[in-house]
Amino acid sequence: MALKNSRNKQKRKPAIATRAIHAGEPRKRYADSITTPIVQTSTFVFADSNEIENYTRKGKTRYEYARYGGPTATIAEKRLADLEGAQDCVVFSSGMSAITTTILSLVHSGDHIIITDDSYKKTLEFCRSYLKQFAVECTILPFGDYEGLEKAIKKNTRFIFSESPTNPYLNIFDLEKLRKIADRHGVLTLIDSTFATPFNQRPLEFGIDLVLQSCTKYLAGHNDILAGAVLGRTALVDKIRDLHKSMGGTIDPHCCYLLLRGLKTFPLRVTRQNETALAVARHLEKHPRIKRVYYPFLESHPHYKIATAQMTGGGGVVTFETKGTLNDAKKFMDALKLCFIGPSLGGVETLITHPALVSYYDYTRKQRYQLGITDTLFRLAVGIEDAGDIIEDLERGLHQL
């Protein structure tokens, strides 16, 4: 009897590690190939005039032109939507293409938007500078000022945009609180969840309207492609898809293939990066030459309780400040042998960047410090190397201080 009852139970949804491999794929594979085919074409042809009319007048689903979509991209979109728990998804040629196209599809002249102040520099620049040309007002608020956020909402506010975790301080937005504020005023919520990935955080489960991902990072995971995505309910994603068809920003089929290949191992990689980042953060926090460490799953992080409540892992980025001067910071960085000096994150190689010298080189010291970008601030994006080797390399650099 117990066996019979167990058969009647609803089937358990496959785990994310399984879905990262199989979601979006037809069981019957093309030419019996186990891997997704790269459909490298600009145009999809019609057999005859009847097939054209079935497509244009009767709405038969098929492909027409690669800027509007293709088979390889469709599989990537289905898999990403499954992992994020979204109804729909559009993939783009980069994360910034996803962000800018999404924003432009949601606003009109005379509208108002709100964005938090520690969002990605290029996202802030787009909202602060370029949207003015379309007569769209942008309010930039300090991250975590929930009271100020509610006061900033106007009748013409279209959406609230933030990252979570943010770059570089890894601040965590209380997604449930954000949704409640937005719901009271009927505005949309957009979260860039690139630093978390759907493995660690799924904002849609908290009622967020749209999630953005730079698939360049953890999802593809090998530092070899650019890709982006927006995910959410179909009614919203369709608006973005329509503008995407006109704006371009189309991802290449070969990049889609590499994204799909990367997705198959992304749960394994992110699990490793979560563990390594936490080990590195704990080691640095005790180091006498380190001033401060920022990592969401450290109890010393200001948003530790929020992070552990809405995330399953802290991610692969550790931000820290060394003691000393800018010259000392340079000595530390130049002594590293394993960690590569460079921007980006989420790949298999460990990367370290110095925001003051790279992202904010064109800011005055006063401007940088107002944003919290100090002379000795570093962002470490751990790869999948051995944690002990990464720590040993950091020790090599810290020995120079």
Regions found by a protein language model. Give the residues of each.
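PLP-dependent enzyme catalytic core of the Aspartate aminotransferase-like
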Residues: M1-N8, R128-S129, E137, K155-R158, ...
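N-terminal "arm"/small-domain region of PLP-dependent enzymes with the aminotransferase-like
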Residues: A2-G70
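Conserved PLP-enzyme active-site core in the AAT-like
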Residues: K11-R12, A17-P26, C89-R289, Y294, ...
